[in-house]
Amino acid sequence: MNDTQVDHSLCMAHGCNMIASMSLSTKGDDWCCFIHVKAERDDWQAITAELNRLGWLVEAVKCIRANAPEKKMVEVRRNIGLAQRSDLLRKESESAQQWYVRLENVLAESCARAILKEGQL
């Protein structure tokens, strides 16, 4: 991919690396991630900044969703450890889907806090 190509599998919000999963239009274009699609456009920059700050977690979510090979999942677990967030490791009792949803919820909550924080500035 060169500088003029756009990865249409990613969210349309500038700089967002999350997977695009929902469309803002009935025409099927303007695809966004699950966080940007629900947000006011005025909040998109704060959301994208927070998702970029948590890039290791965004990558984990993308790997789980893609059912990445074990080699990649080892890297995901290592990055979670490096971020000192062992609470986000997969629990023995949860399926990959449950883990995925839990990590997405962490991202959504963190973005909501970032929006509130920006509104207080």
State what each model feature region is.
Residues 1-121:
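Intrinsically disordered, low-complexity regulatory regions of eukaryotic proteins
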